[in-house]
Curated annotation (Swiss-Prot):
The keyword Cytoplasm applies. Belongs to the adenylosuccinate synthetase family. Its main location: cytoplasm. This is Adenylosuccinate synthetase. Its cofactor is Mg(2+). IMP binds at D13, E14, G15, K16, N38, A39, G40, H41, T130, R144, Q225, T240, R304. Homodimer. Pathway: Purine metabolism; AMP biosynthesis via de novo pathway; AMP from IMP: step 1/2. Plays an important role in the de novo pathway of purine nucleotide biosynthesis. Catalyzes the first committed step in the biosynthesis of AMP from IMP. One of its GO terms (cellular component) is cytoplasm. It holds the Pfam family Adenylsucc_synt. Transmembrane segments: none annotated.
């Protein structure tokens, strides 16, 4: 195993931060390949809790190289706020530990302004954006007017591109969206200061990662969000603006698919999602509220409460197929401890038949009725288990059904938020 991917197999918030931190112990390089600071990871080590948004989880180790690839959109202000936060809690962030792609797109102040104003203009049809400027930044990338990190390293180039973008964006912001114009000089001065601080971290990350893999070093690719938020395979338009599946790794860092050996899908023992969008197994009742409170289901980035529901294996099976998952890591089975009965969705009733795939059309999905299997629950002793054999029998039956239905082995089980509350039962 020289290069492997850690991906969310649901709508994000599956526990990727903890699992990446756990698996990073085996890696020498940890790489982010898509998304931006709209993602949030919580990692607990001992009695300390760390909240990460943009920087890879491997930063908590002193001996790991962390990489922000070209597929990531970088907000310099958010980046240095996160660096300051980490250094304030005793985590060193240096160019020896963190490098950033010169090809990564920069999130600019007008991206955040556009994000907020366009969401407001949608009214009741809003898509639940975090307002971080992620979507507008990716839009500029594909409209070929985006500003990259390498542009910021050349003052004249940056100034010219910024001037043209400010002219165009201000016209749209003021005349179409009714907002206030942004100041060219303020943004220029702010970003030139960022350039000085950013320069030591910048290099061609594709070459760096490629060389590390060729030297047989272990590289971990850390996904953000989840498969059902993928721009192509998610619940469009209630998705993020990047490819969150395994396919995003190759374009998001610049390596070939033959260099990736394994892909681990992270899934909770139940299902959650934030914001609007379809959710077939959602529990809008006391059980859903109970899961939310016991599982502390509130967003790291936004603080928004997460919608909670029964485990939807149709979603996880779809993730396994689309990303070619070689194993699953099932998290938060301790959260379900105490429920007498549990349900798992193994299909949808649709147009008089049962299907086991996720429809592309939201209109079709709205007609789908979950088909459930019921399981007996388990008690809180599950949180004390450190081997598979120590798990309650009912928890084992639940996990076995997950592996059977998705045709994907389970390699890791999470029984609590801390690094040590992790059971390894197989290779990934």
């Amino acid at each position: 195993m020289s290069a492997f991917i850690v991906l969310g197999a649901q709508w994000g918030d599956e526990g990727k931060g903890k699992m990446t931190d756990y698996l990073a112990e085996e890696a020498e390089v940890v790489v982010r390949f898509q998304g931006g600071n709209n993602a949030g990871h919580t990692v607990e080590v001992g009695d300390k809790q760390y909240k990460l948004h943009l920087i890879p989880s491997g930063i908590l180790y002193d001996d790991k190289l962390n990489v922000i690839g070209n597929g990531v959109v970088v907000d310099p202000k958010a980046l240095f706020e996160e660096i300051n936060y980490l250094e304030g809690v005793g985590v060193n962030v240096t160019p020896e530990k963190l490098i950033i792609s010169d090809r990564a797109q920069l999130i600019m102040p007008y991206h955040k302004t556009l994000d907020v104003l366009k969401e407001k203009a949608r009214g009741k049809n809003d898509i639940g954006t975090t307002g971080k400027g992620i979507g507008p930044c990716y839009t500029d990338k594909f409209e070929r007017c985006g500003i990259r990190v390498c542009d910021l390293m050349h003052e004249d180039v940056f100034k010219e591109k910024l001037e043209e973008n400010i002219r165009m964006k201000n016209e749209y912001i003021t005349k179409v969206l009714g907002g206030e114009p942004l100041s060219f000089s303020e943004i220029l001065n702010e970003y030139l200061e960022f350039a000085k601080k950013l320069r030591p971290f910048v290099q061609d990350t594709s070459v760096k990662v490629y060389n590390n893999i060729k030297e047989n070093k272990t590289v971990l690719f850390e996904g953000a969000q989840g498969m059902l938020l993928d721009i192509d395979y998610g619940t469009y338009p209630y998705v993020t603006s990047s490819n969150t599946t395994a396919g995003g790794v190759c374009s998001g860092i610049g390596i070939g698919p033959n260099m990736v050996t394994n892909a681990v899908g992270i899934t909770k023992a139940y299902t959650t999602r934030v914001g609007k969008g379809p959710f077939p197994t959602e529990l809008v009742d006391e059980t859903g509220d109970w899961i939310r409170e016991k599982g502390h289901e509130y967003g790291v980035t936004t603080g928004r409460s997460r919608r909670c529901g029964w485990l939807d294996l149709v979603i996880v099976k779809t993730a396994a197929r689309v990303s070619g998952l070689t194993s699953l890591a099932v998290t938060k089975i301790d959260t379900l401890a105490g429920l007498e009965k549990l349900k798992v969705c193994v299909g949808y009733k649709f147009d008089g038949k049962v299907i086991d795939y996720f429809p592309a059309s939201l209109e079709d999905l709205a007609k789908c009725e979950p088909v459930y299997e019921e399981f007996d629950g388990w008690d809180d002793s599950v949180a004390e288990a450190r081997t598979y054999e120590e798990l309650p029998e009912n928890a084992k039956k639940y996990l076995n059904r997950i592996a059977e239905f998705t045709d994907t082995k389970i390699s890791i089980i999470g029984v609590g938020p801390k690094r040590e509350q992790t059971i390894r039962i197989d290779s990934i």
